[in-house]
């Protein structure tokens, strides 16, 4: 029996990396009976006679996290790709995804693409927004000139000893960026649907690729995103700046809405917390309160 990590899943097969070798495997039949699905990123115990013959996954080891969209396990960090235009830059969509990452204890990074398609004035506006995200704990990359050796190196420097996924809105340029990081990847790039101002999905499967002493994955994009893995009560803890400043609120359980002597609301008024972050927070709370619980029917 050996241990390794699933780096690719395709058509019922799972490629497992173990000691720098790749083994093709299938999941044992009892996984289906136990309603367990192996995920890319899973650490597994498996058996295989050789690299040329299919082996079997025997057990999935405990996951430290599991992304639903995309379905990947044991992720250390996620580079969220946002475009300046086509599709349009959206703070709301960025906040939704960062909230999701916070809920899974995944470090979020933000990379801005298509800056060559906007004016200097628009670039400075977006850059000011992203500077705020950098300040509250999300490393950001917003190059005025795309794909310079310096910016590619800066991204690569985050890879060692980590499993990283690249994700973001469809058509924002995830695969294009990865192609510049390593041209051998030759990943398909997206075309933009002009009528919807959204991209066409091009990444068909999920794969982790060894890059710069780490594993990197390009994942299928999304054109919209609900609020995942959070409730109206836990939402407040998904904002790192709220967690820090909220310690000075009068009430320990302050939700920063109607409560008196709220340090977060005071920080918004003082310009210490970006207004859009708080506005989106209130919107997300309202959306979550409208979600009705789904109850399983009794047999």
Swiss-Prot record:
A GO term from the CC aspect: cytoplasm
Cofactor(s), by name: Zn(2+)
Keyword Metal-binding carried by entry: yes
Keyword match Isomerase: no
Cofactor note: Binds 1 zinc ion per subunit.
Main location class: cytoplasm
Annotated positions binding GTP: 113-116, 168-176
Name of the protein this chain belongs to: Small ribosomal subunit biogenesis GTPase RsgA
Source organism of this protein record: Latilactobacillus sakei subsp. sakei (strain 23K) (Lactobacillus sakei subsp. sakei)
């Amino acid at each position: 029996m050996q241990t390794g990590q699933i780096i690719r899943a395709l058509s019922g097969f799972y490629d497992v990396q173990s000691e720098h070798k790749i083994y093709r495997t299938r999941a044992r039949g009892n996984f289906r009976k136990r309603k367990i699905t192996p995920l890319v990123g899973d650490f597994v115990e498996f058996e295989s006679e050789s690299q040329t013959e299919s082996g079997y996954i025997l057990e999935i080891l405990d996951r430290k996290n599991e992304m639903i969209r995309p379905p990947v396990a044991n992720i250390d960090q996620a580079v969220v790709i946002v475009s300046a235009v086509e599709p349009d830059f959206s703070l709301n969509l960025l906040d939704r995804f960062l909230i999701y990452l916070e809920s899974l204890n995944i470090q979020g990074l933000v990379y801005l693409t298509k800056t060559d398609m906007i004016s200097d004035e628009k670039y400075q506006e977006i850059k000011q927004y992203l500077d705020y995200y950098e300040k509250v704990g999300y490393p950001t990359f917003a190059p005025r000139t795309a794909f310079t050796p310096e910016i590619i190196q800066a991204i690569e420097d985050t890879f060692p000893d980590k499993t990283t996924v690249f994700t973001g809105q469809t058509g924002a340029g995830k695969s294009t960026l990865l192609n510049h990081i390593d041209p051998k990847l030759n990943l398909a790039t997206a075309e933009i649907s002009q009528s919807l101002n959204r991209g066409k999905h091009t990444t068909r499967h999920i794969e982790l690729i060894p890059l710069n002493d780490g594993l990197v994955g390009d994942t299928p994009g999304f054109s919209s995103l609900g609020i995942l893995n959070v409730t109206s009560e836990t939402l407040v803890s998904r904002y790192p700046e709220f967690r820090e400043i909220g310690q000075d609120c009068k009430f320990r359980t302050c939700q920063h809405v109607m409560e008196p002597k709220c340090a977060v609301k005071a920080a918004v008024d003082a310009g210490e917390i970006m207004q859009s972050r708080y506005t989106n927070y209130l919107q997300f709370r309202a959306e979550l309160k409208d979600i009705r619980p789904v109850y399983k029917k009794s047999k």
